[in-house]
């Protein structure tokens, strides 16, 4: 076990590495170690994911940038890994709607239990672990061309932290324990938090938003994991703020008050840039939430951030809340992500891809099945396309194998001394027909 002094010296040395260039910590290594306790458990999946995410952002991504899809189940994340996606995005919106621990359906207003997103991170990582175990038990190793690296980095949504700085600190720790690689925090008031594409958003003072980023970084340092911190600002659209206490915000406050006591602000890109510049020293990536897929707006934000912080990584929400074809022509849509990447937006994601795909495809199947010729539509819309997708690496046609039946047959056989009459795949319809 390392002594307190050894841990402090090790941490001080770590912070001089290129990984931390441009990152401000308003606390000391001694203060971090003081909060750790005598035993600091390792968070292997979080460590692995954070390191992968950092490498992807710095040249290893196939396209030169990471483009993620939102997932809300382990199975969705598994299929993304098989299909070649390089990182998973887990949005609070999707968790609120269909994957929270209250077992209810909510809008994106931080109404669900605060430990719900960490629970889904854990569930996705457990699915990755099972898929990896199945692959490994089948004799497929990393040097095999059939090998799939299932342990994709997970970028998780912490919303506005579900409270104050202590809530943000504890939530970040829970995310890391579950295996998140990166976590984002937004600058809204947690008690009335809204989806970035809703009205009624209320900002907290810039200094308070910074303190939540510091809380997140401190939590990661206490856990001993280089988790990426992503700072999101909603200041492009939000025209309310809780207080005029922070001089940094004074240039945007109009003087008008609301019935709740909030202050009106001048929403827009200048307010967003101001916030982005304030957050940049405390975050690994900066994200400006926008109302439309606007390349010029994205360029203005990127140019302003990079004028003061050259090379600062940026994130962009390619949201389903945008009507893409209403805003852009097909050619621009096709080149949109590459153009963003050229501006420095190296992490791009479709927040609600998982839930839109899941709900639409079920409606499409159910409508045809209910209105038409029954099994014909299941075969045409699901089974035959699944067979056709096998050439691209899709394997869920053999659904018993996919979820681990063969793996647990191996467990049974080992326990029973090498022979068993109760294994599940032998004699199954999958063995006979697929």
Swiss-Prot record:
Alphabetical list of NCBIfam families matching this protein: isocit_lyase (TIGR01346), PRK15063.1 (NF011645)
Quaternary structure annotation from Swiss-Prot or TrEMBL: Homotetramer.
Function field: Involved in the metabolic adaptation in response to environmental changes. Catalyzes the reversible formation of succinate and glyoxylate from isocitrate, a key step of the glyoxylate cycle, which operates as an anaplerotic route for replenishing the tricarboxylic acid cycle during growth on fatty acid substrates.
PROSITE patterns hit by this protein: ISOCITRATE_LYASE (PS00161)
Protein name: Isocitrate lyase
Result of changing residue 390 to G: In strain: S3041
Cysteine disulfide partners in this protein: none
Alphabetically ordered keywords of this record: Glyoxylate bypass, Lyase, Magnesium, Metal-binding, Tricarboxylic acid cycle
Family from the record: Belongs to the isocitrate lyase/PEP mutase superfamily. Isocitrate lyase family.
Chain's gene name: aceA
Gene3D superfamilies per the UniProt record, alphabetical: Phosphoenolpyruvate-binding domains (3.20.20.60)
Enzyme type, top EC level: lyase
Record: residues binding substrate: 91-93, 196-197, 232, 317-321, 351
The EC number(s) this enzyme carries: 4.1.3.1
GO biological process: glyoxylate cycle; tricarboxylic acid cycle
The organism of origin for this protein: Salmonella typhimurium (strain LT2 / SGSC1412 / ATCC 700720)
Consequence the record notes for mutating residue 432 to S: In strain: S2978, S2979, S2980, S2983, S2985, S2993, S2995, S3013, S3014, S3015, S3027, S3041, S3044, S3057 and S3333
């Amino acid at each position: 076990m390392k002594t307190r002094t050894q841990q402090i010296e090790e941490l001080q040395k770590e912070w001089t590495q290129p990984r931390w260039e441009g990152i401000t910590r308003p606390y000391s290594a001694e203060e971090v170690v003081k909060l750790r306790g005598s035993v600091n458990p390792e968070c292997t999946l979080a460590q692995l994911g954070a390191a992968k995410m950092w490498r992807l952002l710095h040249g290893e991504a196939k396209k030169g940038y990471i483009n993620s899809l939102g997932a809300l189940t382990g199975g969705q994340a598994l299929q993304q890994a098989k299909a070649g996606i390089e990182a998973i995005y887990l949005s609070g919106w999707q968790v609120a709607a269909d994957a929270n621990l209250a077992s209810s359906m909510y809008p994106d207003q931080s109404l669900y239990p605060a430990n719900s997103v960490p629970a889904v991170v854990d569930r996705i990582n457990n699915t990755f672990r099972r898929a990896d175990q199945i692959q490994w038990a089948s004799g497929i190793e990393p040097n095999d061309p059939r090998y799939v690296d299932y342990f994709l980095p997970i970028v998780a949504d912490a919303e506005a932290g579900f409270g104050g700085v202590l809530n943000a600190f504890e939530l970040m720790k829970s995310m890391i324990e579950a295996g998140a690689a990166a976590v984002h925090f937004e600058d809204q008031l947690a008690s009335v938090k809204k989806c970035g594409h809703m009205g009624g958003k209320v900002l907290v003072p810039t200094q308070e938003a910074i303190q939540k980023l510091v809380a997140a970084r401190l939590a990661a340092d206490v856990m001993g994991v280089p988790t990426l911190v992503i700072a999101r600002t909603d200041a492009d659209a939000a025209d309310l703020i809780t207080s005029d206490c922070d001089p940094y915000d004074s240039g945007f406050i109009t003087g008008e008050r609301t019935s709740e006591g909030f202050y009106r602000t001048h929403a827009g890109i200048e307010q967003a840039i101001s916030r982005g510049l304030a957050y940049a020293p405390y975050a690994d990536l900066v994200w400006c939430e926008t109302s439309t897929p606007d390349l010029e707006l994205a360029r203005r934000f990127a140019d302003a951030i990079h004028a003061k912080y050259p090379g600062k990584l940026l994130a962009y929400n390619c949201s389903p809340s945008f009507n893409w074809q209403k805003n852009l022509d097909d050619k621009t849509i096709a080149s949109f992500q590459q153009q963003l990447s050229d501006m420095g937006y190296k992490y791009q994601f479709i927040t609600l891809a998982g839930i839109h795909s899941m709900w639409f495809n079920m409606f499409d199947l159910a409508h045809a099945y209910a209105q038409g010729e029954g099994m014909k539509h299941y075969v045409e819309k699901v089974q035959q396309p699944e067979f056709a997708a096998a050439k691209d690496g899709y394997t869920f046609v053999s659904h018993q194998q996919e979820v681990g039946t063969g793996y647990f047959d191996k467990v049974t056989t080992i326990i029973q001394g090498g022979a068993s009459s109760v294994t599940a795949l032998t004699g199954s319809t999958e063995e006979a027909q697929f």
